[in-house]
Regions:
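Short alpha-helix capping/helix-loop boundary micro-motifs
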Residues: 225-234, 250-251
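Bacterial N-terminal signal peptides
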Residues: 14-25
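Sec/Tat signal peptide C-region and signal peptidase I cleavage site
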Residues: 28-32
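Acidic/His-rich structured neighborhood in mature extracellular/periplasmic domains
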Residues: 75-223, 239, 248, 266-270, ...
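Solvent-exposed, acidic/flexible segments
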Residues: 39, 43, 57-65, 92-103, ...
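C-terminal soluble interaction/assembly domains
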Residues: 244-315
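N-terminal secretory signal peptides that target proteins for export/translocation
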Residues: 1-10
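Short alpha-helical scaffolding segments that buttress acidic/His motifs in well-ordered protein cores
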Residues: 64-72, 125-128
C-alpha cells in the first residue's frame, strides 16, 4: 500500500502513484510576527503581505521560511494551476493562493520568495513552471527528473546540493521516461476548464493532445540522491529552505521516478518537512517522522535529491 502522503497522477482514467510533482505552528521567531495566511486573503492583502515580507526579510533563506509558512493550511488540490483562460488543454489559473499541490507549493514559494511582489512573483513563477518561460502545456515542466529539475538548474533558479550533503555516500538513480506513452494515455477526463464542445470537437482536441508526444523520444533520467538509510545522520546538515525531491525505485508500470516535492525547514534547530500533503493541506511534520511513513512501501523510496534555491540578480 502506498504511503498516504504520496501524490498520485492520473494517466487517462487510471490512477497511478506518481509525482506530487511539499507543518503545525512554527516556532521560528519570524513566524511570531508573520502569523497570517495567504489562504482566504484578497489579492490586495496578499500584495501587501508580500511587500512586508520583502521589507522585513532581506535574506532569501528567511523569506523562503516565511513565504512558505504563509501557505500553511492551504487545501491540497491535484493540478490546481494551468495555462489560464487561453490554455489549449488546461485553463486552470496560472497562479493560485486558494489551492496547491506539492509542485505548485514549491513553485509559488520559490517565485514569491525570490520576488516578494505579487505581479513580479507571478511573472517569475511562469519562468519556473515552463521551459524558457514559454507558457503552453507542452513546455510546462511536467516531469521533475527530465524537465523541472534540469530546466530550473539551467535557468539558474536552483542548484543541486545532494553531493554536498551525502558526500561519497551519494547514489545515482536512473529511469527511462516515456513522454510519448504519457501523452498517448490522455483522455477527455483530463481536460481542465474546457466546456461546450461537441463530441466531435472534444475527440479532435484529445487527439491533438495525444499527438504532442508522438515525436518525443524516450529520455534517460539520472538523479543523485541521499540514501534514505543515512538521512538520520545528515538531515540536520540540510539548509533550511532546501527543496527535496523524493526519488523512488524504478517501476516500469509507473511513469516517474520522483514522486513528491517538498521543503526542508528548520524549526528551533529541528528539521521539518513542509509539504502540500495529498488530499489534505500544506502542513509541517518532523522530518524523520515523515520519512518513516515510507518504510515498507511497495514502491521503495530510495532517498532524496536536494536543490538549493538561488538568489536572482536584480531582485
Amino acid at each position: 500500500m502506498m504511503p498516504a502522503r504520496c501524490k498520485i497522477i492520473r494517466i487517462g482514467r487510471a490512477v497511478l502513484p506518481a509525482l506530487c510533482l511539499i507543518m503545525s505552528a512554527c516556532t521560528l521567531p519570524v513566524r511570531a510576527q508573520d502569523s497570517s495566511s495567504f489562504y482566504g486573503m484578497p489579492p490586495q492583502d496578499i500584495a501587501q503581505a508580500l511587500r512586508r515580507i520583502g521589507n522585513d526579510h532581506p535574506n532569501l533563506q528567511d523569506r523562503i521560511e516565511v513565504v512558505s509558512s504563509y501557505f500553511l493550511g492551504t487545501p491540497y488540490v491535484l493540478g490546481p494551476m494551468g495555462e489560464g483562460p487561453q490554455g489549449e488543454f488546461d485553463r486552470n489559473p496560472i497562479v493560485s493562493f486558494s489551492a496547491l499541490d506539492c509542485t505548485t507549493f514549491v513553485e509559488e514559494t520559490m517565485a514569491f520568495s525570490l520576488d516578494p511582489d505579487l505581479a513580479g512573483g507571478t511573472a517569475l513563477l511562469q519562468k519556473i513552471r515552463y521551459k524558457d518561460g514559454v507558457i503552453s502545456y507542452q513546455t510546462r515542466n511536467h516531469f521533475p527528473s527530465v524537465d523541472w529539475i534540469p530546466n530550473n538548474i539551467k535557468a539558474g533558479f536552483i542548484k543541486d546540493i545532494t553531493r554536498e550533503i551525502a558526500g561519497n555516500q551519494t547514489r545515482i538513480a536512473t529511469k527511462t521516461i516515456s513522454k510519448s506513452a504519457w501523452y498517448a494515455a490522455k483522455t477527455a477526463a483530463g481536460l481542465e476548464g474546457i466546456s461546450g464542445l461537441s463530441p466531435a470537437q472534444e475527440d479532435a482536441l484529445v487527439s491533438k493532445w495525444r499527438s504532442l508526444g508522438a515525436s518525443i523520444p524516450d529520455q534517460k533520467a539520472s538523479l543523485p540522491y541521499v540514501p534514505i538509510g543515512i538521512l538520520p545522520e545528515v538531515i540536520d546538515s540540510i539548509p533550511s529552505g532546501t527543496i527535496a525531491n523524493l526519488v523512488r525505485a524504478d517501476n516500469p508500470s509507473i511513469p516517474v521516478m520522483v514522486s513528491h516535492q517538498l521543503l526542508i525547514i528548520d524549526k528551533g534547530g529541528q528539521a521539518y518537512v513542509r509539504e502540500a500533503a495529498y488530499n489534505d493541506k500544506v502542513e509541517d511534520l518532523p522530518a524523520m517522522k515523515y520519512f518513516s511513513i515510507y518504510q515498507g512501501s511497495k514502491w521503495p523510496l530510495l532517498g532524496i535529491n536536494l536543490d538549493e534555491i538561488l538568489p536572482q540578480s536584480g531582485l
